[in-house]
Each structure stands twice: as structure tokens, then as C-alpha cells.
């Protein structure tokens, strides 16, 4: 199991981040940040009132020994509601990608994460965390649908330990063949 205990402890000790969710598997830690916490509805600019909090949080993450050297994928996700014709962005693909880019840029420029560790992806509504269908196969409605949409609007930080060969290459680069 990937060691995510330091992040888990930090989340428990800091109620400001109680809406963040952490899941660990054998090879990675997935930290889910709700879009409602980070961005205004339909926007890709981090809310001014939480930017410093987010920087502090990401600084804590950056300094966790258990994540040292990990590759980090920043994934943006939206709900299944199409953007209006008057929206700032063309569609949920663009919005999800820009949200991931915004968080990754903050991580690199303000918090000091190394760019070579970070990759960015936008998935629109194609990878829901909470399904839009109920147990009986019918589409959710009412509060169940609203809760599914809320859960699916998120940015995920996925920390993965590189394969042994990649870690070795980083410490012992191959000589130039030329």
C-alpha cells in the first residue's frame, strides 16, 4: 500500500480541508479537491479567498517524505451539465483541462513543485466519481443527481511512485550516445 499517512494526518488535523478526500492504493495516493472549494461555478480561476490556504496546503504536500520523487498527475473533472452558449469556455473538456492547468501552475510557480514531475489531464464528465445512474439502472434525479454532480466536479492530484528503472535513471543518467 502506498504510504499516504502524512497527508491523511494533515487533512484530519486541518478542518479547513475537510472537504478534500484521500484514497490510497498499492501504487498511488489520490487526493480529490472539490471544484466548489477551488473555483467559482463555471470558472477556472482559483477563488481569491482560498488561494493562500491552497498554497499552504500544497506546500505541506510538497514537503511530505512519502511523496518525494513521485510523479504527479493533475486531473480536472466536471459534471454532466453542458456549458451555456454564453459561457466563457467552449465546453466541459476545455473547462476541466483549464482547471487542472490552473492548479498545476500554482503548484509549480507558487509552491515550487518541479515541472518535470507534473502532467495535466482534463476529462470533462467522462470519469465520474459518483455514477449518474441508480442501482436500478435509471438516471438519478433530484437531490441524488445534485449530489452526484457535486462529487464529480473536482480536481484530483494523483501521486505515483515512478517505476524502479525511471528512479534509477533520475539518479544515474545514461551518458549521451553522441
Model-found features: residue ranges?
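Periplasmic peptidoglycan-binding/tethering modules of Gram-negative envelope proteins
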Residues: 1-72, 161-178
Amino acid at each position: 500500500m502506498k504510504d499516504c499517512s502524512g497527508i491523511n494526518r494533515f487533512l484530519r488535523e486541518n478542518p479547513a480541508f475537510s472537504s478534500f478526500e484521500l484514497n490510497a492504493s498499492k501504487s498511488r495516493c489520490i487526493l480529490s479537491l472539490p471544484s466548489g472549494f477551488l473555483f467559482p461555478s463555471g470558472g477556472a480561476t482559483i477563488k481569491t479567498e482560498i488561494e493562500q490556504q491552497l498554497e499552504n496546503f500544497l506546500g505541506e504536500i510538497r514537503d511530505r517524505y512519502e511523496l518525494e520523487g513521485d510523479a504527479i498527475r493533475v486531473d480536472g473533472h466536471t459534471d454532466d451539465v453542458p456549458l451555456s452558449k454564453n459561457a466563457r469556455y467552449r465546453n466541459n473538456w476545455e473547462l476541466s483541462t483549464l482547471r487542472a492547468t490552473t492548479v498545476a501552475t500554482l503548484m509549480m510557480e507558487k509552491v515550487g513543485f518541479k515541472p518535470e514531475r507534473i502532467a495535466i489531464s482534463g476529462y470533462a464528465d467522462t470519469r465520474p466519481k459518483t455514477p449518474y445512474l441508480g442501482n436500478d439502472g435509471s438516471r438519478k434525479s433530484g437531490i441524488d443527481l445534485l449530489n452526484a454532480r457535486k462529487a464529480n466536479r473536482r480536481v484530483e492530484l494523483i501521486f505515483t511512485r515512478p517505476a524502479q528503472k525511471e528512479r534509477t535513471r533520475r539518479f544515474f543518467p545514461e551518458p549521451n550516445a553522441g
